[in-house]
Amino acid sequence: MTIKAPALNLPGLGADPLTQRIKEKEKKWKYKVAVLSGKGGVGKSTVAVNLTAALAKMGYFVGILDADIHGPNVAKMLGVEKEEIYAEKFDDGHFEMIPPMADFMGQVTPIKVMSMGMMVPEDQPIIWRGALVTKAIKQLLGDVKWGSLDFMIIDFPPGTGDEILTVVQSIQLDAAIIVTTPQEVALLDTGKAVNMMKKMEVPYIAVVENMSYLICPHCGNKIDIFGEGGGEKLAEKEGVDFLGKIPIDLKAREASDLGIPIVLYGDTPAAKAFMEIAEKLVNKLKEMKGDEKKE
């Protein structure tokens, strides 16, 4: 039976069955990748969304979970924020939400999307304390019909708070991508995020530098607005991989407002950078798990 889903039914399920469902679903996700940042304003969600779209463009089955409960914007960035969410009732009485999908008119393998941004009006704040946030994230993991995925991408809120702990304690991440900018203040907080992932024993940790430089649209020269090389130096210092630099792209704002990932604008520097980063990530994870290259 399929019915329209209400808002998250937080009190309705016991912790044990929900935890079990998460564990069962996790078995169907080949690679689980978190995208996080030590501070806000570095373009973390932009990286998460475009990494997701790049992987789907490569032919992989991808889901993205927006774990930023208080500031969800993944759905809008993928153009599905107005999609209605339906749920299916199971024999034991629990409901599972059916995630909307984005395929951008067949340009990518359909992406499964789940975010609180599809469940509340845009101007309505979500004023929840830690316990409610924890339960919501667990339900987004365990009470959604994710199915089999090559990649589960989880977009964390900035910082090192409850949401991150909840996910890391609920599933076994394969990788953590930490997003920074070249600015010194961003790099300080990025180091904290890297060390948190180390303490959580995430097998593969890498840094991506966003807003690395601007290509002047008039003269074509490269302009290092926020400095140069900070992300790469930090990765070297922390002993983690550096996956690449993403330039400031003047089309990115337009793409984001339209709900189209910039990676689908194939002739742009940012699109090329995202594709290269996605390819590096795939190769690293396959090497780590001993998988053969996808045909």
Swiss-Prot record:
The keyword Iron applies. Signal peptide: none annotated. ATP binds at residues 38-45. It comes from the Archaea. Binds and transfers iron-sulfur (Fe-S) clusters to target apoproteins. Can hydrolyze ATP. Belongs to the Mrp/NBP35 ATP-binding proteins family. Homodimer. This is Iron-sulfur cluster carrier protein. It comes from Pyrococcus abyssi (strain GE5 / Orsay).
